């Protein structure tokens, strides 16, 4: 379902939802390099993974949809950690979908069940969330895909509202003023 490209290591990550794994390809040759995961509930195992994203250090974040978590792998494909669980509390997931990482390492997860985007720190602790159910700007109806560009603009595919919403993350430098 999801794709992520690592231009530094020349790798293409393909989330293969029905196979419950992530296939890694060499960008130059198109040849397979390795496969991450298999069906299961353990570390590095998946139950219908859907989306993937990379941070600046080459860590891979994979939405493990039916295990209700995000799994993190190092640049070599080794399991690092996972966060999230099914529930209705802060930081829990109902239907995790898209995942993206900003320039400061914050992890964004679109949750189609809660109609929001949850933002986590690098340790998987919830910082805040955006949205809620609705059709107004800043509200969502089944958000799915996420992408964050090089200027920290957050693009959210708001599926049933038939739109893409764009948000801007404002970095606060040592001056205390938002960066533009």
Predicted segment positions?
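Eukaryotic scaffold repeat domains enriched in small/polar residues
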Residues: 1-180
